[in-house]
Amino acid sequence: MPNTVVDYLHVVAAVIRGGDGRILLAQRPANKHQGGKWEFPGGKVELGETPLQGLSRELHEELGIHVLQASPLIKVRHVYPEGAVLLDVWEVTAFSGEAHGREGQPVAWFEAEQLPTLEFPPANYPIITAARLPAHCLITPEPQNPADFLQRLEARLRAGIRLVVFRAKLLSADDYVALAQEAIRLAHSFGAKVMLNSPPVMLEEADGLHLTSRQLWAEESIYQSPLRDGQWLSASCHDERELQRAADIGVDFAFLSPILPTLSHPGAVHLGWGVFSATVEQVNFPVYALGGMDSSHVATARLGGGQGIAAIRSLWDGV
């Protein structure tokens, strides 16, 4: 019986952020596999090394820098015709030394929003999404008063929120569109992105569409035809089956919930961090932990393989 277990080559890679937020990329030599394409710097983990040790060594050898601060970002498994790789990606937010191509390779700094315009090896594309997403995602509560809602949203944007899921299930279609347009304009003025949850019509100016777990199983036309190039697709998931369905339809990122008990459903069954980590491990896109989350849980979510946390109450109230 043939062996179907894939042997992945463990490779570490870095999303290196400068003080201005730009990201450092290296260009692969023309004579190498995927030559000429841009990549996130890194290399193979050697026997006996931890991923962080391997990353630190590779970045010093390739770029002449010493890693001072790094945290896990995403793991991506990809099978090329030449072999399979596990990309163990870390976000480097502090380093010493001046980055340069010690092996003669071109290196350059790019704005995060420039990354989708560049050519990368196929395994790198989920990393681009992760690099463009923040660690916090605000899901808006049901709007009661439009003016108060926008004032509160502005306060959260001023506090640093850069990803918003606009949710307004009780508004009429016209009121939804009007308030969503105002929210998008406001968010964009802060450089933030807005995903629309169950909009009556998809808005061109929105940054993407967020699906409920029920909509995951809808006809494809519901979630594909409204999207223009560059708009994201995300989804709410509650178990491995739904997360796999999200992968099958090509979401860019997802929420997995409930991770911890919530104030709204204190006695409900929750997944816990162990299940979160094991489930996230099965997919190649960023996943936010949702349910009982506040900012103190970001580090735990990242260590568990997640992008960060999504929340309504705690992020709306500024916890």
Which positions does each model-derived feature cover?
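Conserved N-terminal beta-strand and adjoining loop/helix that marks the start
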Residues: 2-23, 75
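Conserved Nudix-box catalytic region and its N-terminal flanking loop in Nudix hydrolases
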Residues: 22-62, 73-74
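Active-site-adjacent beta-strand/loop module that shapes the phosphate/pyrophosphate-binding cleft
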Residues: 76-98
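NUDIX/MutT-family hydrolases
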Residues: 89-91, 99-132
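N-terminal active-site wall of soluble small-molecule enzyme domains
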Residues: 163-226
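Alpha-helix-loop-beta-strand connector modules within alpha/beta enzyme cores
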Residues: 179-195, 221-239, 269-294
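Glycine/Thr-rich beta-alpha phosphate-binding loop at enzyme active sites
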Residues: 205-220, 231-281
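Glycine-rich phosphate-binding active-site loops on the catalytic face of alpha/beta enzymes
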Residues: 213-223, 253-267, 292-319
